[in-house]
């Protein structure tokens, strides 16, 4: 992995950061997935770009070696949940978008499963240590959930939300009950 004294960033920012169309699309993605900054988008984009680059490099290999490596890459991406079926092809890898990786983040899955009312509350529950994956407390909202881990996402056993999860009605004041 290299010398720890020479740590490098794992993402690559946009070449032209001030294009209005790019700014609007990034802002929409940040709102949809509850991201804190654009670096999280750029990291997802870089990871997906790396997978697409691997798929393109497979096309140049001899057929025997290509079949082995293609099967390995497809298996890995299926286990990560980025591909829909095990019978996917390289064309499916080349069609990956950063949204497909953002859908696999723990924050997004916690919200989609209904453990949190909003995507922002999902992030807060994760950071505060209320969410566990397979019994292990995970405090990183950007944790990429594998396909086989998806069913084991729940509240951490010692969390106060384990027996009383947040629901849509909590925190709202009924105007009729308030009685001005």
Curated annotation (Swiss-Prot):
* MF terms (GO), sorted A to Z: rRNA binding; structural constituent of ribosome
Q: State the HAMAP family in the record.
A: Ribosomal_uS4_A (MF_01306_A)
Q: Which UniProt keywords apply?
A: Ribonucleoprotein, Ribosomal protein, RNA-binding, rRNA-binding
Source species: Metallosphaera sedula (strain ATCC 51363 / DSM 5348 / JCM 9185 / NBRC 15509 / TH2)
What are the annotated GO cellular component locations? small ribosomal subunit
What residue stretches are annotated with the S4 RNA-binding domain?
Answer: 104-166
Q: Where is this region: Disordered?
A: 155-180
* Similarity section: Belongs to the universal ribosomal protein uS4 family.
What biological processes does GO assign it? ribosomal small subunit biogenesis; translation
Question: In the UniProt record, does the keyword Ribosomal protein occur?
Answer: yes
What cystine linkages occur within this chain? Answer: none
Q: What is this protein called?
A: Small ribosomal subunit protein uS4
Q: Which NCBIfam families match?
A: PRK04051.1, uS4_arch
Domain of life, source organism: Archaea
Keyword Ribonucleoprotein attributed: yes
Complex formation: Part of the 30S ribosomal subunit. Contacts protein S5. The interaction surface between S4 and S5 is involved in control of translational fidelity.
For this protein, the record's PROSITE patterns field holds: RIBOSOMAL_S4, S4
Q: Which SMART domains match?
A: Ribosomal_S4, S4
């Amino acid at each position: 992995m290299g010398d720890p004294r020479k740590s490098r960033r794992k993402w690559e920012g946009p070449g032209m950061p001030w294009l209005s169309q790019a700014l609007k699309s990034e802002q929409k993605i940040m709102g949809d997935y509850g991201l804190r900054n654009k670096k999280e988008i750029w990291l997802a984009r870089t990871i997906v770009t790396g997978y697409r680059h691997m798929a393109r490099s497979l096309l140049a290999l001899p057929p025997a070696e290509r079949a082995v490596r293609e099967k390995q890459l497809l298996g890995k991406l299926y286990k990560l949940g980025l591909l829909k079926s095990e019978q996917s092809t390289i064309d499916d890898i080349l069609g990956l978008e950063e949204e497909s990786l953002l859908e696999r983040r723990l924050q997004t899955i916690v919200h989609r499963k209904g453990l949190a009312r909003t995507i922002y509350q999902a992030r807060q529950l994760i950071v505060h240590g209320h969410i566990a994956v397979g019994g292990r407390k995970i405090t990183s909202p950007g944790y990429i959930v594998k396909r086989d881990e998806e069913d084991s996402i729940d509240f951490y056993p010692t969390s106060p939300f384990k027996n009383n999860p947040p629901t849509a009605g909590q925190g709202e004041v009924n105007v009729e009950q308030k009685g001005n």
